[in-house]
Amino acid sequence: VIAVAGAVDPAAGRHHQREAAEPVLPIATVAAALRQFDVRLDGIDIVSAATEPGRSIWVVLRMDPQRNVAAVAARDSLASTLAAATERLVHDLDGRHCQARPLNAAEITDMDAALLAGLDPDQIRPHWRYLKHPDGHVTSFWVSPPDITGDVLDELVLPDTDINVVTIRLVARRGGIDVSAIVRYHSDERLPKSVWGGLNRLTGRQLAAVRASLPVPAAGRPLLISSRSLGEDEDIVVRLAEAEPAAPTYSPAPVGTSL
């Protein structure tokens, strides 16, 4: 897992300095990391969590060791292989109008807690179109493939919700890369249709949608949603916060619980 934030411009404030470039995360740069020398990643998720204090963004690399036997053997362990792939992507991202750094195990646990946003699996009541819990409602939607653009991704952040979690999934396919996106809203009340009218319901798959945004793979069937091919000339970007990702304010779920 990689944490990404806007780069700090050392020349900021200098006289006659040109306006600094907007900090962004180019999806094409992330997608290129799906194929790295002898390593083939199954997918990469770009996960963002927007709250009132700010926005945190992470990049999650996913790899099937059975498809990378030679690479794992050459490095003696699965952990070393995935760490090498992560470091390569960090190198490609860091300094290009953004800061990138790999997370340690404790930080991944904090990320997991931040994305759950206080959800306790024991207190969730699943409904067909939303999840109910003591603090309100959690509702997930999938984005129509043609709508996966930079402008639409920016519009997914709603100011009247407690937290917005957007997951952009990049998956390697024969001959190309597929992109899909889901969004999750935490709110006090059920969301009116005027808010989500351009999105698609995940009927009966609300728990699976929450699992799909977490860094640690969950047991059970993966969430399958519609995707499209990512064009080689597409310049979709994710706008970044100009500061380091905010520290999570939520506590991890009790040990032994899972969604």
Across the structure, where does each feature detected by a protein language model lie?
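N-terminal topogenic membrane-targeting module
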Residues: 1-31, 35, 50-52
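Structural flexibility/helix-modulation signal
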Residues: 42-60, 68-70
